[in-house]
Amino acid sequence: MFTFIQKIIFPNYKFALILTFIFTLLILVGTLSPLPQKIYAPGSDKWHHFIAFAVLTYPMVAANKRLGFAIVLFGLCLGAGIEIIQPYVNRFGNFNDFKAGCIGIFLGYFSGKLAYRKNKRHHLMTASR
């Protein structure tokens, strides 16, 4: 169990790529699945956008810091594209959803960067023993 958690927190490149692909599919299905009618739900879905895009960005940056710019750009384009397409699938395109996604992207980026540094430092310390 602990090694699986470690693998998620400090993913290698291959596992990070798999996670990013899965999260991308989940975000696309969750945000672009056509609804039979528009739903007016109380509350805020901004937290969902924030968390989804933080989770999307984190693994690739935690696996390889050089991929940070690419995954941030990918997340921004994905978020913008979703908000543009949503009105065509009986959803609401909302700039505030995009802003929440952007904040999530940057949180995922900085969290991934910290995890990458910690993992790299841990490997350097164990290799020198």
Range-by-range predicted roles:
Residues L114-R129:
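Membrane-proximal cytoplasmic C-terminal regulatory module of class A 7TM GPCRs
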Residues A52-F53, G93-A115:
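Alpha-helical transmembrane segments that form the membrane-embedded catalytic/substrate-binding core
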Residues K14-F15, N64-I71, N94-F95:
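Membrane-helix interface segments
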